[in-house]
Design a protein with these regions (language model features):
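C-terminal helical cap/extension that packs against the catalytic core
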Residues: 47, 358-418, 454
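Short internal beta-strands
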Residues: 36-41, 210-214, 345-348, 368-377
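N-terminal leader/targeting and accessory segments in enzymes
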Residues: 1-92, 392, 449
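Beta-strand->loop->alpha-helix junctions that form or flank phosphate-binding loops
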Residues: 37-40, 56-57, 91-96, 227-245, ...
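Nucleotide phosphate-binding/pyrophosphate-handling subdomain across enzymes
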Residues: 2-10, 20-26, 131, 263-369
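Phosphate-binding loop of NTP-binding sites
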Residues: 28, 60-66, 73, 77-214, ...
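Residues in the short beta-alpha loop(s) of Rossmann-like NAD(P)-binding domains
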Residues: 17, 42, 138, 216, ...
Length: 455
C-alpha cells in the first residue's frame, strides 16, 4: 500500500513522543527500506535502530534534508516552515491517517467538550455499529488503529487545533462544538485559531454531515462555505434542530416526527456544557441512523471521564470535585453553574497563555464562592477579575504553590456540606506536567485527608 501523504524516499519525523513513535512504526511497515530521520529537541531514551537522529536547539534545520516531513501536533508549522526546501512536503500523522483510512470518520473538535463528546458518541455508536474505534487526541495514536479496519469501521476521532491546523481532509461527519480563546500563543491569535478549528469542515463534500449548535453565530460564520448537510442541536425548543430540549426532556426531530430520548437530569454527565456535549453526540447518532433504543442504551452505558467535573471524595462532609481539564475561563464558569450554590471554595490558576480572565468576575459574583485558592501566574488575574466585578465582596484569598497546600487550605476553609471545586481556568504547565498530573495530584491529596477533622 502507498499513501499520497508520504512522498519521495526519505522521511523526517519531527517530535518523537507517543505519536512520533507511531508514525515511525507506520512508515517502516509501508517502506521498510526508506531513509528515516527523527528530529527532537531532546535525545530519545530508546533510540530506534536504523534511523538518523537530529537533536538540540537547531533540530529543525534537518527538515531541508528530507522529502517528507511529518510534524507532531505540539510543533508549530510557523517554526518549521523556514527550514523547508522548495520540494519539501510537510504533513502530519492526522493527514496520513485520513489519506489511508478505509472507514467512516466522525471528527470532533471544540475548545471544550471534545473528549467527552467523542467518548459519548463512541459509546452510543457502539450500540449501532459493530466496529467503532475511539482515537486521536483522546486515545492511542490513530495510526495504531488502522489495522483490520474496513469500509464499515467507524472511527470517532477527537481533533485538536494543532491537528487540524494543516489538515487537507475533513471527516465524513464533523462535530464542531464551540470556540473560545485558547492556545493563542501557539496559533498567533484568535483568528488563526478559529481558522484551524474550521478546517474540520472546510473540505467536506455535499454528502458529508456537519453538526453545530444552532445559535452559535461564530460557528456559522467560519463554516459558511462548507458544502455538507447541516444538523443542529439546541438546549431550547427549536423547529430547525435535529436534537433539542423542551421542559427538561431531550427530543429528536426526524423529518417532523418528534421523539423524546431522555430527561436532562438523567444524563450520566452534569452541567450546561455537558448538556451540549450530549446533544451533539445524540445528533451524530441520529444522523448516522441510530434508533431510539440504541441511543438510550449508549447513554446508559457511558462512564464519565476523569478530570472533567469528577467527584473525588467527601472529607469532613466537604465534597471535592476535580475539573482539571478546565483550562479556560468558560470551563470554570460552566462548572460553577453545574454544581450550583454549594460551591464555597475554588482552586484555580496556572500557566498564563494570554487568555482574558475578566469574564470570571461576574461568574464569581453570581455564585456563593467564599474562598479562592490561587496558583501563579494567572491567579492574580483571576483575583483581579473577582474584585473588579464586586469590590465590596469579601473573599478569602490564599496563594498556593503545590496541590497538597491547596487541598489542605480547602479542607481548613470549606464548611461541612459545601463543595471544593478544583477548576483552574488555566493551563497546567507552570507547576504540573499536564492536566492529568494536576488532576491526579488533586485526587491523591484529597484522599490523604482525614475523613473528619480533629476537634
Amino acid at each position: 500500500m502507498t499513501n499520497p501523504e508520504l512522498r519521495g524516499g526519505s522521511f523526517l519525523i519531527i517530535g518523537f513522543g507517543r505519536e512520533g513513535r507511531s508514525v515511525l512504526d507506520h512508515i517502516q511497515s509501508l517502506y521498510p527500506n526508506a531513509r528515516i530521520g527523527i528530529a527532537d529537541q531532546g535525545v530519545p531514551e530508546d533510540r530506534p535502530a536504523g534511523v538518523e537522529l537530529f537533536t538540540g536547539a537547531n533540530y529543525l534545520a534537518s527538515a531541508s534534508l528530507f522529502d517528507t516531513i511529518i510534524r507532531s501536533p505540539g510543533v508549530s508549522i510557523r517554526a518549521i516552515k523556514p527550514h523547508l526546501s522548495e520540494s519539501s512536503h510537510l504533513t502530519s500523522a492526522t493527514n496520513i491517517f485520513f489519506a489511508e483510512c478505509p472507514g467512516i470518520i466522525v471528527g470532533v473538535t471544540g475548545t471544550k467538550g471534545k473528549s467527552t463528546t467523542s467518548s459519548l458518541a463512541a459509546a452510543i455508536l457502539s450500540e449501532v455499529f459493530g466496529d467503532v474505534r475511539l482515537v486521536g487526541n483522546i486515545g492511542a495514536p490513530m495510526l495504531n488503529h488502522l489495522q483490520g479496519a474496513t469500509a464499515d469501521t467507524i472511527f470517532v476521532v477527537e481533533l485538536s487545533s494543532f491537528q487540524l491546523e494543516d489538515l487537507r481532509f475533513s471527516p465524513h461527519v464533523s462535530i464542531l462544538l464551540n470556540i473560545a480563546p485558547e492556545h493563542l500563543d501557539y496559533h498567533g491569535g484568535f483568528e488563526p485559531y478559529c481558522a484551524a478549528k474550521a478546517n474540520i469542515a472546510r473540505h467536506q463534500l455535499a454528502s458529508a454531515i456537519l453538526i453545530t449548535h444552532e445559535e452559535n453565530q461564530l460557528l456559522r460564520d467560519i463554516t459558511s462555505e462548507c458544502a455538507a448537510m447541516r444538523h443542529h442541536f439546541n438546549e431550547r425548543l427549536s423547529a430547525s434542530s435535529t436534537t433539542y430540549v423542551t421542559d427538561g426532556t431531550i427530543v429528536i426531530d426526524q423529518g417532523g416526527y418528534r421523539t423524546p430520548i431522555a430527561r436532562t437530569n438523567d444524563l450520566p454527565i452534569i452541567g450546561p456544557g455537558n448538556l451540549q456535549n450530549s446533544l451533539a453526540a445524540i445528533t451524530c447518532a441520529v444522523a448516522l441512523g441510530g434508533t431510539i433504543e440504541q441511543i438510550q442504551q449508549g447513554l446508559r452505558n457511558f462512564k464519565p471521564l476523569e478530570h472533567r467535573l469528577e467527584f473525588v471524595a467527601t472529607r469532613h462532609e466537604i465534597s471535592f470535585y476535580n475539573d482539571s481539564l478546565a483550562t479556560i475561563p468558560d470551563a470554570l464558569m460552566n462548572a460553577l453553574v453545574a454544581l450550583g450554590d454549594e460551591v464555597e471554595t475554588v482552586i484555580a490558576g496556572g500557566f498564563d497563555r494570554g487568555v482574558d480572565m475578566t469574564p470570571l468576575g461576574p461568574a464569581f459574583a453570581a455564585s456563593k464562592v467564599k474562598n479562592l485558592l490561587l496558583f501563579p501566574t494567572t491567579g492574580q488575574k483571576i483575583w483581579d477579575a473577582a474584585i473588579a466585578a464586586q469590590p465590596q465582596r469579601e473573599y478569602t484569598r490564599v496563594d498556593v504553590h503545590t496541590m497538597s497546600e491547596a487541598v489542605q487550605a480547602a479542607y481548613d476553609l470549606t464548611s461541612p456540606g459545601k463543595i471544593c471545586l478544583m477548576s483552574p481556568a488555566s493551563s497546567s504547565f507552570s507547576v504540573f506536567t499536564d492536566y492529568r498530573d494536576r488532576g491526579e495530584q488533586f485526587k491523591d491529596a484529597v484522599k490523604r485527608l482525614a475523613p473528619q477533622k480533629k476537634l
